[in-house]
Structures are given as structure tokens and as C-alpha cells.
Amino acid sequence: MVNKRIETLLAQLRQQGIQDERLLKAIEAVPRERFVDEAFEHKAYENTALPIGSGQTISQPYMVAKMTELLSLTPVSRVLEIGTGSGYQTAILAHLVQHVCSVERIKGLQWQAKRRLKQLDLHNVSTRHGDGWQGWASRGPFDAIIVTAAPPEIPRALLEQLDEGGVMVLPVGEQSQILQVVQRHAGEFIIQTVEAVRFVPLVKGELA
């Protein structure tokens, strides 16, 4: 039953333009039902966002795939994720690169995600309880940064932690949000607009 649901989801993602086979295999390998509350397990492979508590959500699989594909990852990419949340996006990244650094401002979510990743034998992830606006400077610079909540503007600290040639993908805006791709080239930041999106806000500070 689960396999059929995964196959249906993968077919939908392909129809929506997701082409990276490494990425699709990672999505197939990560059991999304392990990252949602038991009450929502029957919806785990629907192409929709789901609540995970603390006012946060697990993103729609299409958006996880779209943002990940836009990062143009290689196995040696150094990756920073802002907003660990349930840990689902983190798990997808962990299947694609050697190591992932992930920051979560809500301590309870960080702890739960860390436990889920360990249960799935994904040990190539470092998680940190902290302010996503500040990134993780001591682990940078990064080849790829993915932000899974929307700041009103691109955080300066994240731009500074993006390595030359690196790519950052994030939603930007308050009421109206746009998915943007930021590339660092010759010390300049080139910003590309992708599509309109809807994410929870990237809140400053950290929460116990």
C-alpha cells in the first residue's frame, strides 16, 4: 500500500517537472509517514503540506523536491538548512550529500527531528538549536543553503555564509511570498525569481 502511494507521488512529481533521478530516489527512500503525527499518516504521501505542531508544517513534497533540485547538489556539497522542522527535508538532503548542517529555533522540533534521523540511521547530519537568521557561521561557508520558512528579506548572515559559486534557495516576503534562487558569483549576488509560494514566517531568535 505504501509502495503504491510512493509510486503515485513520484509520478506526480515527474509530471510537475522534477527530473533529478538522484533526488527522486531519495524521496522514494525516505518514509514520509515517519515525519508526521500519527493522525496524519494516511496523508503522508499526498502532495500537500501537513501540520507538525508549534505552528509549523512539513512542506508539500513538490516544494521539497523543487527547492532541493534548485540547489544543484553534488555529493560533496556543503549544505546548510534553516528550519529543521520535522526533519523530512533534512533526511532528503542527507541522502544526497556527505553532510548536512541544520538549524531549528524550536527546541522540541529539533529534538524530535534528531531522534527521527537517528532511527533512520542518517548519521551525516548535525542539528543545532538556534536562530536561523544567524545561520551557522562556524560550519561555513556553504555551497548550498536552503531556507524552509520565509523571511521578509534575505538575511545578511546567510548571504555572508554562502561560498563563492554557491546557491541559496528560499521563500521571501510576508503576505505575498516569492521563491528565490540566490547565486554568489565574483562577490556579487544574482537573484532569480522562481514562483509564488506560501510558507510559515522565519522568526528571529530561538524558542526553548
UniProtKB/Swiss-Prot annotation:
Keywords: Cytoplasm, Methyltransferase, S-adenosyl-L-methionine, Transferase. The active site is at S59. It is found in: Cytoplasm. GO terms for molecular function: protein-L-isoaspartate (D-aspartate) O-methyltransferase activity. It catalyses: [protein]-L-isoaspartate + S-adenosyl-L-methionine = [protein]-L-isoaspartate alpha-methyl ester + S-adenosyl-L-homocysteine. The keyword Transit peptide does not apply. SUPFAM superfamilies: S-adenosyl-L-methionine-dependent methyltransferases. Its EC number is 2.1.1.77. One of its GO terms (biological process) is methylation. CDD domains: AdoMet_MTases. It is an enzyme of class 2 (transferase). One of its GO terms (cellular component) is cytoplasm. InterPro entries: PCMT, SAM-dependent_MTases_sf. Gene3D superfamilies: Vaccinia Virus protein VP39. PROSITE patterns: PCMT. Catalyzes the methyl esterification of L-isoaspartyl residues in peptides and proteins that result from spontaneous decomposition of normal L-aspartyl and L-asparaginyl residues. It plays a role in the repair and/or degradation of damaged proteins. Belongs to the methyltransferase superfamily. L-isoaspartyl/D-aspartyl protein methyltransferase family. This is Protein-L-isoaspartate O-methyltransferase. It comes from Pectobacterium carotovorum subsp. carotovorum (strain PC1). The lineage of its organism: Bacteria, Pseudomonadati, Pseudomonadota, Gammaproteobacteria, Enterobacterales.
